[in-house]
């Protein structure tokens, strides 16, 4: 039986993870400015951060240490890539299940 939408919404997210993400994003606003200000600054040719590289580095650090702080940071950097990255071919194109997902390792 397929769960109803409310159950899926409740089970397919982590409130703790979201809280950790939001808390760190709020602290980041003090350090680096609010996301909408960073977006404006980037469009005007101002200072930008290499957030794509930061995602990979945070995942590497998590794999090395097991510290989930790095995964929270990687998730926030992914959000910043979505919002701020100036990739010239940036777009969203949904794909089906054909080969683009995690593989079973155990």
At which residue positions do the language-model features occur?
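Flexible "arm" and connector segments at domain edges
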Residues: 1-106
């Amino acid at each position: 039986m397929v769960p109803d939408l409310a159950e899926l919404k409740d089970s397919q997210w982590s409130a703790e993870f979201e809280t950790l993400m939001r808390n760190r994003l709020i602290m980041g606003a003090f350090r680096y400015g609010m996301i909408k200000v960073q977006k404006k600054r980037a469009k005007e040719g101002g200072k930008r951060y290499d957030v794509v590289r930061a995602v990979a580095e945070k995942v590497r650090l998590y794999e090395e240490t097991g510290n989930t702080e790095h995964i929270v940071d990687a998730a926030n950097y992914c959000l910043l890539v979505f919002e701020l990255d100036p990739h010239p071919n940036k777009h969203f194109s949904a794909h089906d299940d054909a080969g683009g997902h995690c593989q079973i390792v155990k």
